[in-house]
Design a protein with these regions (language model features):
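Papain-like cysteine protease catalytic cores
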Residues: 1-10, 16-119
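Deubiquitinase catalytic domains
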Residues: 84-219
Length: 221
């Protein structure tokens, strides 16, 4: 995770690294228990199925889309699936699905080049000046944690796939966050040694990020 973002973090909530950490972090954000990760999976499965044609385009083909759909289905042995990489929470893939289902901005903070903001691909944003929650996941050694950010903090650039596939009624989602995107770009260049950031890939098809680690005790930082 980028060092310059640390002063803008209000709180970090860890979850157990047992193969479900990304889904557990979403559950915690929604005020549920970590054990509700199966419900989160179920809701995201329905979102993906209901809009399958849109996601085939976003994920650059049916093969990737089916892989993500299969990965959302929980394994029969929920206690022993930490090693089943295909069942983990992957980004950027899940960023789009979560943003669309919950109708809010999703932030993933990881390396400089791969941190992204995800917005709903359809539906307009809420009325101006209405506070909209932001779901933020941080990636620490391939393990996802829930992050609460301070108001007005820097936010990473919008997903390339969002720009390429957003519907007309979703065009203005980014507008309220442009200043925060700009705040992210300036220190990002400094931290990367004054080198311009590597361009993001045009497709989600290659090199997804997997979010999980072997099981470890839960702690709240």
């Amino acid at each position: 995770m980028s060092r310059f973002i640390l002063p803008f973090i209000e709180k970090v909530v860890d979850v157990i690294g047992n193969g479900h950490c990304g889904f557990q972090a979403i559950a915690k954000f929604m005020g549920l228990t970590e054990q509700s990760h199966i419900m989160i999976r179920t809701l995201l499965i329905q979102e993906l199925k209901d809009h399958i044609n849109d996601y085939v385009e976003v994920f650059a083909g049916e093969d990737r889309c089916n892989y993500i759909l299969n990965g959302l289905h929980p394994h029969a042995n929920m206690e022993g699936c930490a090693h089943l990489v295909d069942k983990w929470f992957t980004v950027p893939d899940m960023g789009h699905i979560v943003a669309n289902y919950y109708k809010m901005c999703v932030i993933v903070l990881t390396s400089l080049e791969k941190s992204e903001s995800f917005f709903p691909l359809r539906r307009p944003p809420p009325p101006a000046k209405q506070n909209t929650p932001i779901i933020c996941l941080g990636v620490i050694l391939n393990h996802s944690v829930l992050i609460y950010l301070k108001n007005g903090c820097p936010l990473p650039p919008s997903s390339i796939e969002w720009h390429n596939h957003k519907k007309e009624d979703a065009l203005t989602w980014e507008d309220d966050y442009l200043d925060q995107h700009e705040l992210f770009q300036k220190p990002m260049v400094i931290e990367s040694g004054n080198k311009p950031p590597q361009p993001q890939k045009e497709s989600n098809k290659a090199a997804p990020i997997l979010l999980d680690t072997p099981e470890k005790p839960k702690q709240i930082i």
